[in-house]
Amino acid sequence: MTRRPDFRRASASGRDLATEIVYTCDQDGAFAHAAWSRALSGRNPDPRERRLGMELAFGSIRRKKTLDWCIAKAAGRSIEDIDPLARSVLRVGVYQLLFMSRIPAHAAVSEAVESARRLGHPGIAGFVNAVLRRIAS
């Protein structure tokens, strides 16, 4: 059983908000709008970060099957065998790489790795880095 991430350590960035929502929907079966409201309580992100977070979260949930296929292929293992936090960070990162052309690939990879490091541990960050670089190339 993996330990639940402490999302209070998350920044107010749209990427961290999106990761929290994707994680909550995946692990708790929460509806996206309910998870979004819960994630925003007590936070006041910049309007641009709020919009980015909403696009990343809802887009990652909407494209989950496509993202999971890409992640599993690049990771060389089943999506279920990937740590839940790493899986959520990867979904948000891969969504940026595949569906958000205005975000440079290096920024998507770098921000996902930082998010994984902040919310998880160095091993998750290294794994996220390897998988995203493989997909980005």
Each language-model region and where it sits:
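Class I Rossmann-like S-adenosyl-L-methionine
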Residues: 1-137
